[in-house]
Amino acid sequence: MAAAVSCFLLPDAQAATDGEERTLTLAEVIGMAQTESPDAVAARNTYKSAYWSYRNYRASNLPALSLASNPYLNRSTDYVTMGDGSVSYVKQNNVKTDLSLAVTQNVWFTGGTFQVSSTARRLDLLGTRSTTYNVQPLYLTYQQSLFGYNSLKWDRRIEPVRFREARKQYAETMELVAAQASNYFFELASAQTNLEIALTNQAAADTLYRFALGRYHIGTITENELLQLEVSKLNEEANVLSAQISVDNAADNLRSYLNIKDEVELTVVTDDSVPQFDVPLSEAMALAIENNPDIEYMKRQRIQGESNLAYAKANAGLKANIYLQLGLAQTGDDFQKSYNDLLDEQYVSVSLSLPILDWGKGRGQVRVARSNLELVNTQMDQRMIAFEQNVQLVVKQFNLQARRVDIAHRTMETAAHRYDVARQLYVMGKSTILDLNSAISEKDSAYRSYVSSLATYWRLYYTLRSLTRYDFEHDMPLEYSYSDIERN
């Protein structure tokens, strides 16, 4: 069945749409949607954001090399407290320059930060030509929280899951875009079908009315039956106008979704055949659990809940931070000589904080976090059940839909044949107008049901692909070019 109906347009309507026409198949619409539609563009940008967030996370676990300098000029008057308690004002007139090179590495399993640095400083006293140097050729620094929340460890568990979720979410969205594009495609196909039906019925009603006029004049039908045919003719004319508006609206919706800027008349052509294959439920379920982003989302929510509980526990008890620093340093009036006879330097700092009386605040925060974790686990269990039920439902519906398409097609052909027979019988005066109207109604309903069954088939087809990230028709996984998005 060809759903394109431009050749059926009334003369007035045809004159109004004599511009460029573009006929699209379902495959062409889906290809354009996955490239140009707002949903596809949003999906690419969402994935790109997730990709760079993950890159930033991975970079935070690698050694970082930095160069720092903080030169300043100081010309001011400052006071100095003398030994007897008096205050003396001293004029400051100096320039300080420094340069520091440091390598910093986060240590995820302890949550600390390790740094190796080398620093050189120069102090010039203006007006005296006095210059001194302070060098620290090698300095090692380590700091961490001893009993606190280790964000590095939890990020190591959460961020890879978040990125896998983003990759799978992009794949799912591309298939959902295909499903949405098929909805717009069949919305236009259905509107075109209704217009084709309306045009056919209008032509038939006009022919029957003209034929009935002749029969009325020779007295073989009543005036009531003639008026009934005239009303039917007028109704069909109104139906054509309504159907044309529906076609225009559906075409505008499709044009908008495909981001087509040109003013072209869009028509779509449906294919009678649909792929004939069954999907094993067990295989679909296993693939859905492996490939669907919802599974990664549920996993991430559970880990996030555990992380929140660990954070609450860490903040409720003893907090301790340690800062260690050791290295070599020296000062002198000559830069090169400053590196001679280097002195050892060590610095150790430990800070402690223990809540003595917080009126149960810390314990309450732990209980809230634990309750939230239990709630998340319950919600994720229910979400998993709903997910599995949805997969089962989609698979069962899809496995039946090809048969339904075949039944709808045969019903459409049978109803069309019945209409032809009923029309001939009415023309021959062997049936009533009620029988003819019934045949017309069944023909129209069967035609619409067939297009609707095709739309349902392709919606289920792409929904199943979105759930499993698998092409069951060709028995192969769906692949997407992530690298092209990551490079842009």
What are these regions (language model features)?
Residues 16-183, 320, 324, 360-363, ...:
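Short flexible linkers and secondary-structure junctions
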Residues 24, 157-287, 397, 401, ...:
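Periplasmic alpha-helical coiled-coil/stalk elements that build and connect Gram-negative outer-membrane
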Residues 41-45, 58-59, 107-132, 146-174, ...:
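Sec/SRP-type N-terminal targeting helices
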Residues 1-21:
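Bacterial Sec-dependent N-terminal signal peptides
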Residues 30-34, 86-88, 221, 226, ...:
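Amphipathic alpha-helical coiled-coil scaffold segments and their short linker/junction regions
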Residues 49-52, 57-59, 206-210, 234-260, ...:
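Short segments within alpha-helical structural elements
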Residues 14-20, 66, 73-75, 274, ...:
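Acidic, low-complexity, intrinsically disordered peripheral segments
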Residues 102-104, 141, 310-311, 351-353:
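Outer-membrane beta-barrel architecture
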